[in-house]
Amino acid sequence: MKYLSYYGSRLFTLFFIAALVSLASAQDKTKLKAEDIWAKHIESIGSKDAIAAAVNRKIEGSATVRNLRVTKATVTGGAFLASAAGKQVTLMAFQTSNPGDYSGERINFDGKKLEITLVTASERSPTGTFIFQYPEISKGYIFGGTLFSSWSLLDAAKVSKFELQGKEKIDGVETYKMKFVPKGGTSLTIKMFFDATTFRHIRTEYTRTETAGTVRSDEGRLNENRYKLIEDFADFSKVNDLMLPTSYKVTYRFETAQRANEFEWSMKLTRFSFDSAREPEIFLQKVIP
């Protein structure tokens, strides 16, 4: 009996180990690859027909801009986004009291040329300056994410690299973190984050670190200038058969040897208009207000 009990126990252990190995193997087979996440993300937006029917888009809502570190001031106004056949525009207009106050932002890419308004006689806003210095953010059809019909992931020809780099939690949400490189390349490090359950695109981060060339006397190492632009997308809702974010936030922060600051644009989008044939008037008039 002891002999049978011993070998019965051994057999049970072997079967248990085999079951675990089989389960691990099955999990490996079902582990998602980058192309799977990409495909599921497109499915999360809507059907091919619904996406095609919304090639021309107008989106309106409210906007606020905040200086998060220095003045901590908040200004409110309106937001307008439009896209059509490789064109995209982001407009914000803010209520101001004085002629020299920050009155708004205009980021316009017509498929060839990127234009970003000056907010003073000779300067763009810090956020606008960063986007202008790295035009691939807009020209690569990354900026604005799924809000624009020209979103880079809807066209493989716009993508050079889409690489899975594991999982990461964003505000408590488990996401797939992807390294992204647009066609034509970039000197930025670009990460995209996709909800691990719904595969919705909820964040893009653009970072740039530069050696300042001066040595910190206390640490004996070179100073670095750090720049980071973050786009956050939230409050997804079904709009004309598409699942799109209705909250859109752009945060830009920088830290240099001389100073540091952080700015935030926040938009609540409430009115969506899609058309399969006619471009938004803002493109037909060829005048961007």
Task: Give the predicted meaning of each segment.
Residues 10-22:
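Bacterial N-terminal signal peptides
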Residues 24-26:
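Signal peptide processing junction and immediate N-terminal pro/mature segment
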Residues 29-30, 34-125, 158-166:
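N-terminal mature ectodomain segment of secretory-pathway/periplasmic proteins
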Residues 77-90, 94-96, 100-103, 252-256, ...:
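Extended low-complexity acidic/polar segments
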Residues 167-286:
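Gly/Pro-enriched, hydrophobic low-complexity segments
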